[in-house]
A protein has these predicted regions:
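Residue-level signature of the transmembrane alpha-helical core
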Residues: 14, 37-40, 69, 97-100, ...
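C-terminal membrane-associated helical module and adjoining short loops/tails
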Residues: 1-7, 17, 27, 35-43, ...
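Membrane-embedded alpha-helical segments that form the functional core of polytopic membrane enzymes
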Residues: 16-65, 78-98, 156-171
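A cytosolic-side transmembrane-helix exit/cap motif
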Residues: 54-59, 111-122
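Membrane-water interface of transmembrane alpha-helices
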Residues: 104-112
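Core segments of transmembrane alpha-helices
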Residues: 12-19, 70-79, 106-107, 129-141
Length: 196
């Protein structure tokens, strides 16, 4: 099977993740800079693969399968590493847990609804959620470099990143509820048909 360019980009995003993890543990300046650039590059391929698939009409079932998996691997890995090194700490960890829980929930819902041949369309709000999520993680990855570059009164890169992470968590709850409602409605509908 010949791989299409959007699929190659998606696979590339998955391949970036272990490199991202390894560079995260480099001490000092490069330990902040390299993971940041790798995460931004991987996030950009998420936008680019979808755009190219639509422009060149190269949307595929493989792309539909791999794209959300690649996103979840990237985001989950970044959040776990940021919690592990103390960038996300104390009550902020709740925001990370909300985001990760929603991703697991949606994966299960997609599989359940797919059996009923119901497509879970990505909404504009979900796309906004993803953008804010990626932006917050990217800012948090800048570490001390980001804090030196962005420092206005009580707001530095870390503070802005955490605020955006909480906003992302709120949008995650809202969009997750919408998907969950569709899943529950479908399950009730199926049970009703079986009881007849």
């Amino acid at each position: 099977m010949k791989l299409k360019i959007p699929n190659i980009l998606t696979i590339g995003r998955i391949i970036i993740v272990p490199i991202f993890v390894l560079t995260f543990f480099i001490p000092g300046f490069f330990g902040d800079l390299i993971p940041f650039f790798l995460f931004v590059l991987a996030s950009f391929t998420d936008y680019l693969d979808g755009l190219l698939a639509r422009i060149f009409k190269e949307e595929s079932k493989l792309g539909e399968l791999l794209d959300p998996i690649a996103d979840k691997i990237l985001v989950a890995t970044a959040l776990i590493l940021l919690v592990m090194n103390g960038t996300i700490k104390n009550y902020e960890v709740i925001a990370a847990i909300i985001i990760l829980t929603r991703e697991i929930l949606i994966s299960g819902l997609r599989e359940f609804l797919a059996k009923g041949q119901i497509d879970m369309q990505v909404t504009g709000l979900s796309k906004l959620k993803t953008f804010i999520q990626m932006l917050s993680i990217a800012i948090l990855l800048t570490g001390e470099i980001g804090n030196k570059l962005i420092n206005f009164q009580d707001y530095n890169a870390q503070t802005i990143g955490i605020i955006l992470l909480w906003l992302s968590a709120f949008l995650t709850l809202y969009t997750g509820y919408d998907y969950l409602r569709k899943g529950i409605d479908h399950a009730i509908d199926q049970d009703t048909k079986e009881d007849r």
